[in-house]
Amino acid sequence: MSVPGPRRRRAFLLTALAAVGIVVSAVAATAPAPVKAGPRNEVGPAASDDWFVWSKSREPRTSPLDLYAQQTGHAPFKVNPKNTQAYAGAIDGTTLAYQLIRGNLADRSDLRLYDLAARHLLPMPSGVNTSRWECCVSLSGGWLLFSRGHSYSRDRQLVLLRNLTTGEQRVLDQLRNKNGLASAGQISGTFAVWTKCSPYPVCHIYRYDLASGTTTTLPTQAGKVVYSPSVNESGTVYYGQSNQGCGKSVKPMRQPIAGAAELITALPKRRDIDITYAHRLPPRPPGDVVTTRVYYDIVRCRTHQWDIYSVDDSERIPPPSPPTP
């Protein structure tokens, strides 16, 4: 699936449960709901309990995209400066991490941190941005996940994890293949995910556990392309699966820590997705079911019109085992 514009050149309890190996089981997923579906292209969702951030085209047809933020109950506002383009990455509290694209040819890309409540930039630690192409950023708990290097080029592509407090940096993956890509997905709690195709369409999704320092390759169905991963705090990964080409048997999937991959929703024919973003909703009584709202942008392959939808995926946390006598 191709991407719009230059993007690709672009909770304590749950954390504790994941750390000790508690498994959650699927309950149900809701029907897809439109989130942003206006006359302009709207892509690249990111969300928190109180904020939603996305990119919107300046014209009804394909055109440069600006980044907008909207607090619940308030009007949206533009985030990126004039004469730039931008894509959302992730929201952690009121801090937004995003990709800023500059230059007449949109050939320069860096990462930014932004205070949504105060509406101003925050300092980015030295060494995150370089003269190379940084993109595809995500943020959680003081860790920044991002990509460096142009995909489908002779660049050395890196998937990096950077601690914004200590400066520790981990290289999660790397690739040098002019027919491939290594692209960061999302970090949530102690889990990070990314995609590597070497070459495309031979693609795999990886899940990294920060606590143990281990990487797991997700199972892939033979002959299928997998892409656009996101992850929640319990390690469940959401992604797209399809045949090669736009809108070819596209299936939004979920892969829990244990068990087989499952379909979470249906997609109309000749539709495809580019970005998924997983946000864990606040728990509701009795507390044994947790819900992840999965946002995704969807494109009509013939008209190239983009909208944003969401689906709620619920999982049940089993009761704790009785103490050993």
Regions found by a protein language model. Give the residues of each.
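An edge-strand/N-cap motif at the start of beta-rich repeat modules
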Residues: 28-69
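Multi-bladed beta-propeller domains
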Residues: 29-40, 72-84, 117-131, 165-180, ...
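Blade-level signature of beta-propeller repeat domains, shared across WD40, Kelch, NHL, RCC1
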Residues: 273-325
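Secretory targeting and sorting signals
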Residues: 2-32
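Loop/turn-rich, solvent-exposed surfaces of beta-rich toroidal or solenoidal domains
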Residues: 223-254
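Residue position within the beta-strands of beta-propeller blades
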Residues: 52-55, 96-99, 143-148, 192-195, ...
